[in-house]
Structures are given as C-alpha cells and as structure tokens.
Amino acid sequence: MKKFILLIIALFYTVVAYAQGTDQVSAILQHGDTETIFIGNTGFAQAYEAAVDGDVIILSQGIFNTINNISKVLTIYGAGFEDNAETNTATTTINGTVRLGDGSDTEFDGIHIEGVKINGYMGLNSQLKNVTIQRCCITNNVELNHNTENVTFRQCYMLGDILGQYKHANGLLISNCYVSKNINNFSVNSFVHIDHSYMGNMYSRVYREYAQFLWTNSIINKLSGDLPLGYAAIVKNCIFFADNYYNDVDLENCYRLNSVADIFADGENADYSPTRTFELKDPETYVGTDGTPIGLSGGAGWNKVPSNPYVSKVNATLSGTQLNVTYEAGVNK
C-alpha cells in the first residue's frame, strides 16, 4: 500500500508536468510515514542528502545526475533500465559513475538498487554486505575495490567487465545476468557463483586461478587464454561453443554446440536487444540443476521490470481549469 501511495504522488507530478508542457523528473524520499519529493535532475542527489539509513528513494523515468558516493544503507527504485513497450515505461538513468561506500572500512549492510540504468562505472568501494543490484543496466565495468560479502547482481545487463581488483569477494552471485565481457581478478579464497547467466568473453587473467568459481546453468560464449573458467572451477549444466575448457576444471552435465545460433529459439546470435527473451530452442534438452532451462530464461527468468509499482498509461486532458486524468498501473513481483 505504501508503494501505491508513492505511485500516486509520482503520478500527480507527472501529470502536472504534462499539463505545463514540461518534462520534469522527480525523486521521492520515503522516511517512515513521511514522503518528500524533489524535482529535477538533481532530485536524486537532494533525496540522498536528506536520507538516512533505512530510507527508500523512488526515481521517476528520466535522467538524474549521479552523486559522489552512496554511503547510506538505502533502497533505490527506478522505472526500469530501458524503454519498455509492454509496460509503457521509459528509462531511469543515473548519469555517471555510481560508487557504493565511501572508500573506508565501514560496513554497509543491505543496500538495494533496482530498475536503473547506470551510465558509467559501478564501484564497490567499502565493506559491503548483503547488497543487491537487480534489474539494472551498467554500461561500463563493475569494480570491487574493497572486500565484500554476499553481493548479488540479479537480472542485470552488464556491458563491461566485472573486476575483482584483487579484493576478497565472499559469496559474489551473478544470477540471470547478461554479461557482455569478462569476470576476473579476484583474490585468494574468493567465492564467485555464476548462475543462469550469459557470459560473453571469458579470458584468463592473473589471480582468477586462486578464487573458487562455481558455474551453473549458464551459457558461456567465448573462451581464451589459460584457465578462463578459473583454477579447479566447478562447472555444472552449462553450454559452451568451444572445447578449450582447460585442465583442472570439473565439468558435469555440460554441452558443447557449434554455434550460438543453435541454442536460441529465435535463431539469432547472442547479441543483446531489448525485445529478446533468450528462450532456448530446446528447453527440455538443456536443463539446469534446478529443473529449469539453462541460461537467462531459466531460474528467476529474464525479467527487467522493477518490483515497484509503475504507471503504464497516462491520459491527461485540460477542460477549462479542470485537469482530467486517467491512468493504468501495474506491479511486478
């Protein structure tokens, strides 16, 4: 109910902007039972400055300026990381690098970011714990610049590398993510789990061999160099398109196909597009450890709509001094 109240507030400002012929963006700060709205591209920064640990920030569609770092335990929702014809929603963009933490050894436990396009790098810069980045697009590298524990990326579109920066990652989970490039550079005894994901280009890099990698239910496109999956990696129910798995890798129920186009129902290669669902051509043949199809369509599925309520259709008309508004709203699970 609280989220729907915030939705109505956001809707109010949307239609006011519509009536005024402007294209405003807004950020709503929820602190307990109090909601405060901030208008304009600096709205996110203003909401952040006013927030305390445990608060929620809801960003409208549109472009927001980034901030120096996020060093408060907040939940941040956007409208989605790309325009969506099905829900009739547009993109929420944070323009610039997003840094979680302030570079100190301070522990930040429970940050959640969902439904946002981050137009730049993402840096994990403090001792982060139980952090979830969900249904987001990150246009450049993700860099783990500090030791972390139980960090999850779920249903994200990641255009750059995931770089461990020689730090210790205790329980890094990449789940139902499309990763265009590589994941590497983790310190001794790190544990990294890639599940129901697409990995674009795995190539060997120093220090990966010292981390424990668990690969499950994933599609791995390109492999090159020495130990591209990690030394003594465990690999279960994955699909490859090359046979250079290399030594000291434990393969279980894996498949090798000749071409990426052989696996997807649409017969296309692995290139990303907003309309693709990455359904498998033979989902009953290529089954994961959990009984669902290997790849993005299995597990939690390839779902890009954030879990906060969204306005799918707005119709605002002026009749004299009266503003008449009709709208449709929905919520994702």
Predicted regions and their residues:
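Acidic Gly/Asp/Thr-rich repetitive segments characteristic of extracellular carbohydrate-active
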Residues: 27-64
